[in-house]
Amino acid sequence: MARIYASLFERLVANTYEPENDQACWTWKGKLHYKGYGQLNARIDGKHTTMFAHRCMAEIMLERKLEPNEEPDHLCLNRACINPDHLDPVTRKVNLDRKVARMKAMRKGAKVMPV
């Protein structure tokens, strides 16, 4: 039987591995998308839907829906992380610009560290 959670936040936290410390990633231990992002299934307004765990967490912390052009950038570089301190809601362009900058730095031999 499926567990009933008091809130979506409680469900998200219950489905992460215990973080090593206060700054560590909250790594999703449920289903992963083929690109490494955490996924969960839910019924909203009577309809079954699949959602990304990091997007749900960002919306909970922002107390609003993400705008259509907005996405949470993983500052920790861990796609399975849902720690709200590691998620920065930015536009798609900013997220891609950051990705390109990290890739260029890595090609030059720099060790890319999380922001």
Where are these regions (language model features)?
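Conserved recognition-core residues within compact binding domains
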Residues: 1-72, 77-115
